């Protein structure tokens, strides 16, 4: 279940929900 946002969850519209701020 990997993806451009992995391991962060993504919405159906393709928006990424980056929970880990350390990746900024």
UniProtKB/Swiss-Prot annotation:
Gene3D superfamilies: Laminin. It is a peripheral membrane protein. The keyword Secreted applies. It is found in: Membrane; Secreted; Cytoplasmic vesicle, Secretory vesicle, Acrosome membrane. GO terms for biological process: angiogenesis; cell adhesion; single fertilization. Its main location: membrane. Specific ligand for the alpha-v/beta-3 and alpha-v/beta-5 receptors. Also binds to phosphatidylserine-enriched cell surfaces in a receptor-independent manner. Zona pellucida-binding protein which may play a role in gamete interaction. Contributes to phagocytic removal of apoptotic cells in many tissues. Plays an important role in the maintenance of intestinal epithelial homeostasis and the promotion of mucosal healing. Promotes VEGF-dependent neovascularization. This is Lactadherin. It comes from Equus asinus.
């Amino acid at each position: 279940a990997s993806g451009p946002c992995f391991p962060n969850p993504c919405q159906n519209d393709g928006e990424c929900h980056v929970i880990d701020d350390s990746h900024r």
